[in-house]
Amino acid sequence: MSYLIKPQNYKPLLDLKQTELGIKQIKEFFQLNLSSELRLRRVTAPLFVLKGMGINDDLNGIERPVSFPIKDLGDAQAEVVHSLAKWKRLTLADYHIEPGYGIYTDMNAIRSDEELGNLHSLYVDQWDWERVITAEDRNADFLKEIVNRIYAAMIRTEYMVYEMYPQIKPCLPQKLHFIHSEELRQLYPDMEPKCREHAICKKYGAVFIIGIGCKLSDGKKHDGRAPDYDDYTSKGLNDLPGLNGDLLLWDDVLQRSIELSSMGIRVDKEALLRQVKQENQEQRLELYFHKRLLNDTLPLSIGGGIGQSRLCMFYLRKAHIGEIQASIWPEEMRRECTALNIHLI
């Protein structure tokens, strides 16, 4: 079901023309900073991939991809990508990228099973990135170093926005707070995971939650992850499981946390075998991507995605992602947004 968060007395700080210019400037500035921080080369990415190769991402493992038949391939099915986590790792191998360097791309996707609302659209645009690492890099300290570099690019971009539009005051804290999902559960034991995220983000402003996908001490997961890209079972922060996480910011307009990036150190052979066994999905090991990984023809890597529209939405103090990107929305939501001074593109 769709949802709509209704901020009180919302008034956009920018008109439509200023908004479009702001979107352009943010996207250009941030991707250059991201590229230089992580030493990433821009590459061209697919909008769709062949079904049955194990290349498309399953996200939480339940989302259905948009698919269509290809006439010239005997009606073989293609799937519109959800994200490019596995494709990027294959590309690192094909491009023979050295450790310490990587790639990024403008990723466009369709997620038809999304619950539409202020933060969720059918259309997804993000910077998908992947970087080759060594076995010695597969630890929580290295994960935190990479996350802090990404956050540094975010801080610089926020100041650039302030230079363009002085009415938009910087609000990001200079330091990002790290916490494991188990520590977060113990801090707020009576809350649901999303409410924990809101509480910790309201306190610190910017938070990276480590260990997304691993089982916590209550037997539950903070959130789901497909078992074949992020490593969420190897020991990480404070000897707790997980070498991945989510970067979240406190949004003053919506008065809640928003997830800007999901990322992590990717599974090696041992973590892949362990995680697919835990999830009873060992049949995946017969797919092309998984065979490449098991045969040691893919590099060790770290990677993730950074939401472009959400980042712009945060910087420009917008109440709805539809003020940043063009998509399809329920008619009732459009009417309500108009009444709330939220102008959907």
UniProtKB/Swiss-Prot annotation:
GO cellular component: cytosol
Annotated localization: Cytoplasm
Organism: Bacteroides fragilis (strain ATCC 25285 / DSM 2151 / CCUG 4856 / JCM 11019 / LMG 10263 / NCTC 9343 / Onslow / VPI 2553 / EN-2)
Listed name of the protein: Aspartate--ammonia ligase
Predominant subcellular localization, coarse grouping: cytoplasm
GO molecular function per UniProt: aspartate-ammonia ligase activity; ATP binding
Source species, domain of life: Bacteria
Gene3D superfamilies listed in its UniProt record: Bira Bifunctional Protein, Domain 2 (3.30.930.10)
Enzyme kind, highest EC tier: ligase
GO biological process, one term: L-asparagine biosynthetic process
Protein family (similarity comment): Belongs to the class-II aminoacyl-tRNA synthetase family. AsnA subfamily.
Catalysed reaction equations from the record: L-aspartate + NH4(+) + ATP = L-asparagine + AMP + diphosphate + H(+)
E.C. number: 6.3.1.1
Keywords: Amino-acid biosynthesis, Asparagine biosynthesis, ATP-binding, Cytoplasm, Ligase, Nucleotide-binding
Pathway noted in the entry: Amino-acid biosynthesis; L-asparagine biosynthesis; L-asparagine from L-aspartate (ammonia route): step 1/1
CDD domains in the record: AsnA
